[in-house]
């Protein structure tokens, strides 16, 4: 199989990280990302190394029997989610298979090495679970109107305005729509990755699941020619704070970033409203979080994770560590 070969195959499994193994009618195996076991797919080989071919997904010809869920309206174009058409329990089964294969490849099977596999602990919430999003400014097609959202699958430049994203709650969607409406009406240009010209870059939104506190950080360049920045930012603050939210605003921030890299980099932050931080709670502990804090993006899922670790430490004797301190030394905010 050579580079440029166009073929079809059926995905027999998906290995970590997101590598579908498609089998052709001739029995050849090709790695095709962003696929689901059971799908019949069309691909184009774009890499051959050590007799292993990797292909780019061109089209899903037949759905997998696993695909029984109605996806988010942006699914397919948006590059953020892969398995939304698969029921959550089946997603956990896929993860279990991948994790066990990784462990077996490293140390052998449970029988060979004697380890105990306790399974996959799922998230209490299956939708609207994220407490953080980084939206990008751009356009959905070349020279199109302003967009705010996620990158299209497989595209470095084009975006999808994810105004109905299902992995965040309505407050996130309201903030996205208010921001896009405001800057569109004011004809403010986004930072173009090719020309390195423009003002708008990213919108960071965080909301605490337990406390309901919200913080928003608008990331821009310092290219303010033709822009009354003070007036513009005052209008942005007003556009956000006059909408209805289930949570409550703790802060509106403005961060400057003139780096050419397409990453959120803090080169100076000012507070437009409120505070530069908010609080979230996990297992009775309170955490102070800023826009740039490392923190688990699924608060309720994080509680499951930490509670499991706590059970390992305590065992059957929960009173033995009463009043003692456990240090989590690789935990970001924690």
Regions found by a protein language model. Name each.
Residues 1-334:
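Accessory RNA-recognition modules of RNA-modification enzymes
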């Amino acid at each position: 199989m050579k580079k440029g070969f166009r073929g079809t195959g059926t995905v027999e499994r998906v290995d970590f990280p997101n590598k579908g193994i498609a089998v052709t009618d001739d029995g050849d195996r090709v790695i095709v990302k962003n696929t689901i076991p059971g799908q019949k797919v069309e691909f184009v080989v774009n890499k051959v190394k050590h007799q292993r071919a990797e292909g780019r997904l061109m089209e899903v010809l037949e759905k997998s029997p696993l695909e029984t869920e109605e996806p988010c309206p942006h699914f397919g174009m948006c590059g953020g989610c892969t398995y939304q058409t698969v029921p959550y329990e089946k997603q956990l089964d896929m993860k279990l298979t991948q994790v066990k294969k990784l462990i077996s490849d490293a140390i052998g099977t449970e029988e060979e090495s004697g380890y105990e596999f306790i399974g996959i602990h799922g998230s209490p919430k299956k939708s609207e679970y994220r407490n953080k999003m980084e939206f990008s400014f751009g356009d959905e097609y070349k020279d199109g109107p302003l967009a705010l959202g996620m990158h299209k699958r497989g595209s470095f430049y084009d975006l999808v305005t994810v105004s109905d994203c299902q992995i965040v709650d309505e407050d996130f969607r309201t903030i996205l729509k208010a921001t896009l409406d405001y800057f569109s009406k004011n004809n403010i240009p986004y930072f173009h990755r090719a020309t390195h010209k423009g003002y708008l870059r990213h919108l960071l939104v965080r909301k605490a699941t337990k406390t309901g506190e919200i913080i928003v950080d608008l990331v821009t360049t310092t290219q303010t020619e033709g822009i009354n920045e003070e007036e513009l930012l005052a209008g942005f603050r007003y556009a956000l704070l006059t909408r209805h939210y289930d949570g409550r605003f703790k802060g509106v921030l403005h961060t400057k970033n003139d780096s050419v890299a397409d990453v959120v980099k803090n080169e100076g932050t000012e507070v437009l409203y409120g505070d530069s931080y908010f609080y979230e709670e996990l297992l009775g502990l309170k955490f102070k979080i800023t826009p740039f804090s490392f923190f688990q993006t699924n608060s309720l899922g994080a509680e499951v994770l930490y509670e499991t670790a706590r059970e390992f430490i305590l065992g059957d004797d929960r009173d033995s560590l009463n009043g003692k301190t456990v240090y989590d030394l690789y935990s970001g905010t924690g």
